[in-house]
């Protein structure tokens, strides 16, 4: 007789754009995971109001309010979509309470996670960090290049619609660049990484666009191209709006040192141009920067949930 598996209940701290979009995704498409609570600090926020209409438990008293609620004992996974400073406070309390934390801020208390690159080796982590929207969009490309050739240097430029950048994003610009650059190295495999974010004020708003530059110590363009296309297909498994804007560009170099590399010998400058269109669950389609964060976080939560369900079976 087949056993019915009970989904893992999740709570989301942060009732802004990211938290609300994540809630809608879980309600519509979540696998092995279900909404338990949406937590905010403003009782009149659109996110909390929408959650109440959808029958989701809410509190406007932050993490303390969630911890006092009767539903807290049933929560297995907690998403934090607040701010880096707030998550630093939340992380220790969640750890003490035995809750798995998925951090959507740049706090980086736990290991960086990009689902298609390093999720499987971090399934036992109690707190994981989703890097940044720019990191989720570009680190898979850096990793795709790095798995076929050494990458002494990688640089990314993330351009997002100004209208999609809420107060949390704007308050965390410095943390965004620092966290993304570090994750390009730690997760992407580049020896040195650099990140730039651009808030595009264009009206009507443009969808997220990302540029990735890698210095690769190889001349095998076909191997690099195949690896990049394979990685893009894998990311599209959870972010359907993720795509190449144009074909991968290569510039052969006689000597890597001419462009800042430490090794002599032939190399390639690899340029990859991406765009990310949002699914439109709660946010407009131009907010691909927010959609890729919530989609990646949900992919991590679903994998964690399968692990927890198997352990409880």
Swiss-Prot record:
This is Acetaldehyde dehydrogenase. One of its GO terms (molecular function) is NAD binding. NAD(+) binds at residues 15-18, 164-172, 289. It comes from Rhizobium rhizogenes (strain K84 / ATCC BAA-868). It is an enzyme of class 1 (oxidoreductase). NCBIfam families: ac_ald_DH_ac (TIGR03215), PRK08300.1 (NF006157). Its EC number is 1.2.1.10. Keywords: Aromatic hydrocarbons catabolism, NAD, Oxidoreductase. InterPro entries: Acetaldehyde_dehydrogenase (IPR003361), Acetylaldehyde_DH_C (IPR015426), NAD(P)-bd_dom_sf (IPR036291), Semialdehyde_DH_NAD-bd (IPR000534). It catalyses: acetaldehyde + NAD(+) + CoA = acetyl-CoA + NADH + H(+). GO terms for biological process: catabolic process. The active site is at residue 133. Signal peptide: none annotated. Belongs to the acetaldehyde dehydrogenase family. Transmembrane segments: none annotated. SMART domains: Semialdhyde_dh. It holds the Pfam family AcetDehyd-dimer. CDD domains: ALDH_C.
